[in-house]
Amino acid sequence: MRKKFFLTSAAVLLTVATLQSAQAATDVQKVIDETYVQPEYVLGSSLTEDQKNQTLKKLGYDASKDTKDLKTMTPDVYSKIMNVANDSSLQLYSSAKIQKLGEKSPLEVKIETPENITKVTQDMYRNAAVTLGVEHARITVAAPIPVTGESALAGIYYSLESNGVKLPQENKDLAQEELKALSDINDENKDKSGFDANKLNVALADIKAAVAKAKESKGELTEDDVRKIVEDTLKNYKLDQVVTGNQVNVIINFAFNLSKSDILNNEDFTKTLKDLKQSIVAQAGDSFSNIDLNFDANKAIQDGGNILSSIWQAILDFFKSFGA
């Protein structure tokens, strides 16, 4: 009886934790819808006054209409938001604006200074923002000097948390892990024949959707399950012969970590990924003309499970025949 009580209590606690994390993902969009009718601006603390004015102009700031206080991302704020050691020498130039969009509008990200955001593309930001729980919003990024752009999302986290969103650390960690994986792989392959950043972004969107679908139907996924999803998806997008084994493992590690996250319990997660995929494909011209866009990486796991079930049933039937 005592054992049963402890097991029941553990199950209740696990359920509560799951619901809280899923609720946090939902709260992201709810707060955006309720609070960001006027845009909010987060500026890097390393900007000079001239750079600050220049960046605000790039972001579309209008002092007569944008009456919210400007926020500043300092090294101290960054360390608290990202749960890392405080480094006072950290240079923060990337700045961002976030504003709500209508419910039927897809997530938008625009880099106003693409010449200065050297490592992260608009679609990489969009992919990571979906992982964070953003469904429909307009995010704008700018920097006055060349920077990688990897810290820009931290400004979005800061803004959201300042407005009451309780972002689980795992959601932020996953979004940053994804952003780093995408930007590193893109940077390492940008001059390689056969590589296409659009295909990489769509492949990752498909991988995330397949992981969510597989977890819903199968429960906990093994690393082999996730590996199968990743490898089959990269092959479908003709990236399997382009990316290295180490890069594949980076994607697998991210996808496996994602499979354990409660962000997948957000019912709008896969819909937002579908919208993201469709918009990338629509803007990419003929890059996807020879690609199966209806490919389902989850099917391979289901087929594998069916084969194992058939083998197991055959074994049972074999032994039953002796008992008859």
What are the language-model segments listed below?
Residues 9-17:
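Bacterial N-terminal signal peptides
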Residues 39-43, 109-116, 139-146, 190-193, ...:
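Second-shell loop/turn segments in exported
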Residues 130, 135-241:
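Soluble oligomerization/assembly scaffold segments of membrane-associated complexes
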Residues 1-5:
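Positively charged n-region of N-terminal signal peptides that target proteins for export
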Residues 18-32:
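Sec-dependent signal peptide cleavage junction
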